[in-house]
């Protein structure tokens, strides 16, 4: 760092920094453990499902730090942003500087809209970096001007958006209403005090006109207070402004009355000062209005003083002194009003940013929920949470490869396969093929919902679903048959529209299933059982265009459908081997009128179309796009779904249209305003009188927060000192030299304070001075010392001059006339100016916005005590002489008593103003703390979403959905010319699997399968297999692909990924052997590998699924199904590539491959034996840590949910609380009504023995 660059780092900046959350077990590779991925997501699902309580309105790498306290500007010191940092919510715009070194706008317009977020490495999907919050220049019309860090007022301190300005005015409406009431009450109490004193002390009765005016003005102020209080729910900002104008008019009229001799406070200069201070600091007037009002009041008083002089000792210097006095109060008032309003606007923006962060957090919650539900049905998540929520043993969440399986009886399983799809895929482009599949399966999903079926999975062109899961249904077989009939009608309509020979082959069987999720990667909900295998074989042994059912399904149909013999044994070896009787549903004689409603609409209009395309969705219905409801738009607030709108606090938007962006934020702010009106945060976190936080740690962080307007406050205090000097110079002491020395010293001392606090903005100053400046600005105690020193200097400037009054040469007390008094300009002739300048010193306390209000009160009391001591004892004669000279006998209250009353009024006004500012600043601080917590949670949620998205899509595909402009509404599809495809099955697992009491109806068999798949998944975590993507598991078959990354398609080593796939196949055989040793089994893998061109894409909107299609996929599958257990079979084309890469093969011969040999004849195949020589580029195996089964993930999140619940119960009435204390844990997590799980015969949560 250069010596000229001094960065002031606040000790409290960590409060505004998104703290890193070190991933457990991270080895530096950038991988994050998966066991906490579902924590907030499932909590959100649970809360959405069961919690309807009232919601309050109220990471890795080095983060960019920024402190921006209430009333502060963005000219803070920010350290350099590292390359791996995450932008905080409160940050400078890209075009803003940490320090302004010249006369510039406080909020300069940003030069660009780019983000400063660093790169997240090669695996970053691009949505972990928080969106940079808009800078203040995006909100303000004119944020003021600054020079060397000192902010100067502007008259147009308002927001650009009218809606935002309206919300801001409403946000602080209650505070301003209260300030006006307090000001009027204070004025009324002053009048009543004077009235009581007059009745008690005055020797003569009160002038009737004076009494009438007193009662009239008191009545006006009482009526104003009553109207403002009574109409508080209906009071608008404009109405409040007009009431403020009426209050000012009433006070100014009293000044006029005092000038005419009908006031209770002498000539009324002190009351003018109070009126000016109240106009700027307590009345709800815009700054422009306040300036006009202040100038009008000042001009009125000066005019009256000149035209109707009421003092015996009078001079032009005294008039000039008044002018300077009023100028000083107006200048201080402008600074106070502007900086106070600016502080409130900053607090409002922080509230808005907090609301925006909360809205983004809810959006992330909704994305998380959709991601979870795209993998797992809601009933499974809720049942798992319900069963695991009482598990308190911490070590259970770390147990190895847990599974969670449900068993359901009395269900029907439907398998459907598109006949002719392979030939169709060769005639369509990648985009057309994926679009067709998406539209076709979207219709099937819609039909499944109508017929009460649950879609399980899509396997290429195969679709299968289950009825009776999760809700039990007596007509589950009927639902599947109706589903099959609708599918056949749909595919026939497709065939008629596309002119392609496609049809459906459907098989249905009834029985029981086990359902759940296996493995560590690419989670997909699936079903397993003997009955699932039968349904699959019924499909493969069926007839295109017909529904092939078993005897079990026929028995469930109760004769409601006409059937005929299916002869499935003749077409399928499995059916023949197990002697399964089959039947075919007779196709009903129906026309297109019985098609699904949306297709009927299309068929009616299709005859009118002259140019029909290849798709079949030209009607009124169109399928949703995959992930359209999950990722939303990049860098914008995702629109809330109508279902998710109910999640907003207090169901804010139940009756509203779905909105997004600023409109939704503004709606939420309105709700926040309603909550804020109850002062919940103040009662819960802030002590009533001192306004200190009840939490000592919060108080410490708040006290260490940088005060960005401290320099401006100090400059304003220095200006006040200059005005005090000017006033007392116009009315000099008889001892001119001591006074000159006094003010010279005070000005130099104050100049030194200003210099030492602004030195950081002057690079020409010594480095040690600038570092001292940084330390002062960042240290609470040092700032307070400077503040007290400034107040003391101003106070000494106001009071010390009284020491130079010479009683020996004082003016004569008798026989003075107005004409002869013009020569007397000694300040001792006007002792009340000692009080007026003392009032200016008191106003100096109000200038320092961040000074604690209790400390202000203490300082003000000390000032009044010193003045009382001087006026009542040492210099009482000076005031008595002045009263004898200028006041008539009717004046019951002397100058010194009136002065103390005036100071008491200022004490109450300044203290209340300080309390309001401090409350605003502390409330702003609480909002920031809350926003920071929610942003950290949002960051963690986004990390969870990224990892979950990785479990659904390859990284480059995930980036497509997150970075691409989603307005184009294009499906994701990609053609690849050189990829490797592998299928690895366990042929012996079907014989091993059995549903008996001994193995818990097949659960123990699936437990072992889970261990096998999990071991396979862990192999993919090794660096050498980073080019391989798991696609899915199909029963006991494992499917993986290499070369899908666009980089691999363009690299020089075109088939390096294929070699990695072959190495992976060899590693799988070693892994299964290791499993056999520990499980006492003798499983063997049967693996098939092929390479070539494929089409990849994402289909399905509700359950998006990434898949690949093409001849290469079919050939790899046939290499597996026609292979030999314990061997790896490849076709000749793959053999020719791998043999040159150091692999050894054994020639098998020519085999018949269904679906391919019909056109190309028999296929030459080879068995992969291994590597002849090791690959020198293969690094030693290195496992990435932190992979756990789905059950371990959910178990961990449940225990975390319980811990969070305890924390939230502590804040049950807090704005940020979303869980009420009265709910019972069991009630919260137990499904209500006829929920799923009633049909589950047993669930498994135990571990592998």
UniProtKB/Swiss-Prot annotation:
Stretch list, region Involved in ORAI1, STIM1, PPP2CA and PPP2R1A interaction: 1-180
Glycan-bearing residues: 815, 819, 886
Disruption phenotype: Adcy8 knockout mice are fertile and seem normal. However mice reveal a tendency for both male and female to be somewhat smaller from day of life 45 and 30 respectively while food intake is normal. From there, females remain 10-15% smaller. In contrast, male transiently grew more slowly between day of life 45 and 92, after which point differences are not significant. Mice are less nervous.
GO cellular component terms, A-Z: apical plasma membrane; axon; basolateral plasma membrane; caveola; clathrin-coated pit; clathrin-coated vesicle membrane; dendrite; excitatory synapse
SMART domains (alphabetical): CYCc
Reactions mediated catalytically: ATP = 3',5'-cyclic AMP + diphosphate
Positions with a binding annotation for Mg(2+) 1: 417, 461
Chain positions of site Essential for autoinhibition maintenance: 1198
Transmembrane segments: 181-201, 210-230, 245-265, 272-292, 294-314, 319-339, 714-734, 736-756, 785-805, 829-849, 859-879, 892-912
Cofactor binding annotation: Binds 2 magnesium ions per subunit. Is also active with manganese (in vitro).
Binding site for Mg(2+) 2: 417-418, 461
Location of the region described as Involved in CALM1 interaction in the Swiss-Prot/TrEMBL record: 1107-1249
Cofactor (UniProt): Mg(2+); Mn(2+)
Residues flagged as site, Essential for autoinhibition maintenance by promoting interaction of the N and C termini: 1197, 1201
Positions of region (Disordered): 14-33, 50-118, 1221-1249
Subunit structure: Homodimer; via transmembrane domain. Monomer. Heterodimer. Oligemer; via transmembrane domain. Interacts with PRKAR2A and AKAP5; inhibits adenylate cyclase activity through PKA phosphorylation. Interacts with PPP2CA and PPP2R1A; does not mediate the inhibitory effects of PKA on adenylate cyclase activity; interaction is dependent of catalytically active PPP2CA; antagonizes interaction with calmodulin. Interacts with AKAP5 (palmitoylated form); promotes the phosphorylation of ADCY8 after store-operated calcium entry (SOCE) stimulation at membrane raft.
Comment block on domains: The protein contains two modules with six transmembrane helices each; both are required for catalytic activity. Isolated N-terminal or C-terminal guanylate cyclase domains have no catalytic activity, but when they are brought together, enzyme activity is restored. The active site is at the interface of the two domains. Both contribute substrate-binding residues, but the catalytic metal ions are bound exclusively via the N-terminal guanylate cyclase domain. The two transmembrane clusters are necessary and suficient for the plasma membrane targeting and oligomers assembly.
Family stated for the protein in its record: Belongs to the adenylyl cyclase class-4/guanylyl cyclase family.
The protein's role, per its UniProt record: Catalyzes the formation of cAMP in response to calcium entry leadings to cAMP signaling activation that affect processes suche as synaptic plasticity and insulin secretion. Plays a role in many brain functions, such as learning, memory, drug addiction, and anxiety modulation through regulation of synaptic plasticity by modulating long-term memory and long-term potentiation (LTP) through CREB transcription factor activity modulation.
Protein name: Adenylate cyclase type 8
Gene source species: Mus musculus
């Amino acid at each position: 760092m250069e010596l000229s660059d001094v960065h002031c780092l606040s000790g409290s900046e960590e409060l505004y920094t998104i703290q890193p959350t070190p991933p457990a077990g991270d080895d530096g590779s950038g991988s994050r453990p998966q066991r906490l991925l579902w924590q907030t997501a499932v909590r959100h699902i649970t809360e959405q499902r069961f919690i309807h309580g009232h919601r309050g309105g109220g990471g890795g790498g080095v983060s960019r730090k920024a402190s921006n306290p209430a009333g502060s500007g963005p000219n803070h010191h920010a350290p350099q942003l590292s390359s791996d940092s995450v932008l905080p919510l409160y940050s400078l715009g890209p075009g803003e500087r940490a320090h302004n070194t010249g006369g510039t706008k406080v909020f300069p317009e940003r030069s660009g809209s780019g983000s400063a977020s660093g790169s997240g490495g090669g695996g970053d999907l691009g949505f972990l970096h928080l969106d940079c919050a808009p800078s203040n220049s995006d909100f303000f019309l004119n944020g003021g001007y600054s020079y060397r860090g000192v902010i100067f007022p502007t008259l147009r301190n308002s927001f650009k958006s009218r809606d935002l300005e309206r919300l801001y005015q409403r946000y602080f409406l209650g505070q301003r209403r209260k300030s006006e009431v307090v000001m009027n009450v204070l004025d009324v109490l002053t009048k009543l005090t004077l009235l009581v004193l007059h009745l008690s002390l005055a020797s003569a009765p009160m002038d009737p006109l004076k009494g009438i005016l007193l009662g009239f003005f008191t009545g006006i102020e009482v009526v104003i207070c009553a109207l403002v209080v009574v109409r508080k729910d209906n009071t608008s900002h404009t109405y409040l402004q007009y009431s403020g104008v009426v209050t000012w008019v009433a006070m100014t009229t009293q000044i006029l009355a005092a000038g005419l001799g009908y006031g209770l406070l002498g000539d009324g200069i002190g009351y003018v000062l109070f009126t000016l201070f109240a106009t700027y600091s307590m009345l709800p007037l815009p700054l422009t209005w306040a300036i006009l009002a202040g100038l009008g009041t000042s001009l009125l008083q000066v005019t009256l003083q000149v035209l109707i002089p009421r003092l015996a000792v009078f001079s032009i210097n005294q008039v000039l002194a008044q002018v300077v006095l009023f100028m000083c109060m107006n200048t201080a008032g402008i600074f106070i009003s502007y900086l106070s309003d600016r502080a409130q606007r900053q607090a409002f923006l922080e509230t808005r940013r907090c609301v925006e962060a909360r809205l983004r957090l809810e959006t992330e919650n909704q994305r998380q929920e959709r991601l979870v539900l795209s993998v797992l049905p809601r009933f499974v998540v809720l049942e798992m949470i319900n069963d695991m929520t009482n598990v308190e043993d911490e070590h259970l969440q770390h147990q190895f490869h847990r599974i969670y399986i449900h068993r359901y009886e009395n269900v029907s399983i439907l398998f459907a396969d598109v006949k002719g799809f392979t030939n169709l895929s060769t005639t369509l482009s990648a985009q057309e093929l994926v679009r067709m599949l998406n539209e076709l399966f979207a219709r099937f999903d819609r039909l499944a919902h109508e017929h009460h079926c649950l879609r399980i999975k899509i396997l290429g062109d195969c679709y299968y679903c289950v009825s009776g899961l999760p809700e039990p249904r007596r007509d589950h077989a009927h639902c599947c048959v109706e589903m099959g009939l609708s599918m056949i009608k749909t595919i026939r309509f497709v065939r008629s529209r596309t002119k392609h020979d496609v049809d459906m082959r459907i098989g249905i069987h009834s029985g029981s299933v086990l359902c759940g999720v296996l493995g560590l990667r690419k989670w997909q909900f699936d079903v397993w059982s003997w009955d699932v295998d039968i349904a699959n074989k019924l499909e493969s042994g069926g007839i295109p265009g017909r529904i092939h059912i078993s005897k079990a399904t026929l028995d469930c149909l109760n004769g409601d459908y006409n059937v005929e013999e299916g002869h499935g044994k003749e077409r399928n070896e499995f059916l023949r081997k197990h002697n399964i009787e089959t039947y075919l549903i007779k196709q009903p004689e129906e026309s297109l009128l019985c098609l699904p409603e949306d297709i009927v609409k299309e068929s009616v209009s299709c005859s009118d179309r002259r140019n029909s395309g290849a798709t079949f969705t030209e009607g009124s219905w169109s399928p949703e796009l995959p992930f359209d409801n999950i990722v939303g738009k990049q860098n914008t607030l995702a629109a809330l779904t109508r279902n998710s709108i109910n999640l907003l606090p207090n169901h804010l938007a139940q009756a509203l249209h779905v909105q997004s962006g600023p409109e939704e934020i503004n709606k939420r702010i309105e709700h926040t305003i309603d909550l804020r009106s109850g002062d919940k945060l103040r009662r819960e976190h802030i002590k009533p009188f001192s306004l200190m936080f009840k939490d000592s740690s919060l108080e410490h962080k708040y006290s260490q927060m940088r005060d960005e307007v401290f320099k401006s406050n100090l400059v304003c205090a220095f200006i006040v000192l200059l005005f005090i000097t000017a006033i007392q110079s116009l009315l000099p002491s008889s001892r001119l030299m001591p006074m000159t020395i006094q003010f010279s010293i005070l000005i130099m001392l104050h100049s030194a304070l200003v210099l030492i606090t602004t030195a950081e903005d002057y690079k020409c100053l010594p480095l040690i001075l600038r570092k001292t400046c940084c330390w002062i600005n960042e240290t609470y105690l040092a700032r307070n010392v400077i503040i007290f020193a400034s107040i003391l200097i101003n106070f000494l400037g106001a009071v010390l001059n009284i020491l130079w009054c010479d009683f020996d040469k004082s003016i004569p007390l008798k026989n003075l006339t107005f004409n002869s008094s013009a020569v007397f300009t000694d300040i001792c002739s006007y002792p009340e100016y000692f009080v007026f300048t003392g009032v200016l010193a008191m106003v100096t306390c109000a200038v320092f916005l961040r000074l604690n209000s209790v400390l202000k009160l203490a300082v003000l009391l000390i000032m009044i005590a010193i003045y009382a001591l001087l006026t009542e004892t040492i210099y009482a004669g000076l005031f008595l002489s002045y009263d004898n000279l200028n006041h008539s006998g009717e004046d019951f209250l002397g100058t010194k008593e009136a002065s103390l009353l005036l100071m008491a009024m200022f004490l109450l006004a300044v203290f209340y103003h300080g309390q309001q500012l401090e409350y605003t600043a502390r409330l702003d601080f609480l909002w920031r703390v809350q926003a920071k917590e929610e942003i950290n949670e949002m960051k963690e949620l986004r990390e969870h979403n990224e990892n979950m998205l990785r479990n659904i899509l390859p990284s480059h595909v995930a980036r497509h959905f997150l970075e691409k402009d989603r307005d184009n509404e294009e499906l994701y599809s990609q053609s690849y010319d050189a990829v490797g495809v592998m299928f690895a099955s366990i042929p012996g697992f079907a014989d091993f699997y059995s549903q008996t009491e001994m193995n818990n109806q097949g659960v123990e068999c699936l437990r072992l399968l889970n261990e096998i798949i999990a071991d396979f998944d862990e192999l993919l975590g090794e660096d050498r297999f980073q080019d391989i993507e798991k696609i899915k598991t199909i029963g006991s078959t494992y499917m993986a692909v290499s070369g899908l990354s666009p980089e691999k398609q363009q690299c020089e080593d075109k088939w390096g990924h294929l070699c990695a796939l072959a190495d992976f196949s060899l590693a799988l055989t070693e892994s299964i052997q290791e499993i056999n040793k520990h499980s006492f089994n003798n499983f063997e893998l049967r693996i098939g590998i092929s390479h070539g061109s494929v089409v990849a894409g994402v289909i399905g909107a509700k359950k998006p699924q990434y898949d690949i299609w093409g001849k290469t996929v079919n050939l790899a599958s046939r290499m597996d199904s026609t292979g030999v257990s314990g061997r790896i079979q490849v076709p000749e084309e793959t053999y020719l590539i791998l043999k040159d890469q150091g692999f050894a093969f054994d020639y098998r011969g020519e085999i018949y491959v269904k679906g391919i040999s019909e056109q190309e004849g028999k296929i030459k195949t080879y068995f992969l034996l291994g590597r002849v020589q090791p690959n020198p580029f293969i690094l030693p195996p290195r496992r990435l840590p932190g992979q756990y089964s789905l059950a371990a993930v959910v178990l961990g999140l449940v225990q975390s949910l319980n811990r969070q619940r305890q924390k939230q119960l502590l804040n049950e009435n807090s704005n940020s609380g979303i869980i009420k204390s009265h709910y019972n844990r069991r009630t919260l997590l137990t499904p209500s009504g006829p929920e799923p799980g009633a049909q589950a015969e047993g669930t498994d949560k135990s571990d592998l023995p």
